[in-house]
Amino acid sequence: DMFDVTTVHPYVKFSPYADHEPLTSMRGLLHAVAEAKANEGVTGKPCLIEEVGTLGNFVCSKEISAGYAKVNAYSAWVNGMTGFMWWCAHEQSNLAYPPYDWCPLERELGMLENDKSEKPVAKSFRLVRETIDALGSTIPKAQTDAVCVLAGGSNDWRNVLGSYVLSKQ
């Protein structure tokens, strides 16, 4: 009751059961919305997918990051999510002081290069925005015709993610 919305930070690389296949697999591509929908189901509050990304060149090419962002942004939209925010706007590789120089993994995640030119992921976001604007920003809410009952055990996330992926096939 203290919050209007909840948030998730769904990185496939750090999520159990989501990283068993390539980032661009069905499981990898559905992970963000699956986590957010599970959060909504448990809390009864809308969920914002914030701080999502691919971890940049550490995990994949700029083109794969762009495709991942596009699929997930569309998925967030069609599944009625509150929003979808990429991490982050700018590269941090030119910031040679703490905390930015502590972890090489976190330095090249931006939508813009250090010179502020667009990376392919920024172009994907523009395409998604233009498509949504052209189609109209609202779509019918999906009907829920099944639920996943959680027992509260250590493998709940495995069951949630597996059930969500199966429901989309």
Segments (PLM) and residue ranges:
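Carbohydrate-binding surfaces of carbohydrate-active enzymes
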Residues: 40-169
